[in-house]
Amino acid sequence: FNHIPSGEKFDIGADLFPKLVENNLPFYALPMDFEWVDIGKVPDYWSAIRSVLQGKVRQVDIPGKEVKPGVYTGLNVAVNWDKVNITGPVYIGGMSRIEDGATIIGPSMIGPSCCICEGATIDNSIIFDYSKIGKGVRLVDKLVFGRYCVGKNGDHFDLQEASLDWLITDSRRMDLSEPSPQQKAMAELLGSDLINIPD
């Protein structure tokens, strides 16, 4: 396209559209019956997920089946509803496991094939596919994606580099060993809230 320069940052909405109008080139719009939600940055993504869970985005429904008021699940979610504390709006992806004693406070989204271990707390957080949140871990206002933990403002850290990958890891890993004596000592020091993941 000859109006987009190569080799430099160029935004369609901020650069191209104004350039077309400025040069009196054809530029058309069409009314559409949907709501545009921009997710260019982490805070935007965070806001979009919250808005969907709270029913604020027109023509977008929470996927899955509503199993309790404000709590939606995909297929084959393993949970004993009498032994967990879940306050919606919450979405739990298919094939996920929520262990007894876990707490999930919405708006929160847990992707497919996740494991939220006993005593873990997920509060206003987004957990991506195949994440395992260890016993007693408390996540508030966090986004967990692979080996990264991201705050809602975009600040992040690498769980492996921070040596916290024994608390939050890939649910598909089979090589998990018993926590080291140092890790057990840290858990005892921190008490029932095993760890608050830092901002």
Model-derived segments and their meaning:
Residues 1-3:
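Conserved nucleotide-sugar donor-binding
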Residues 6-199:
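Left-handed beta-helix
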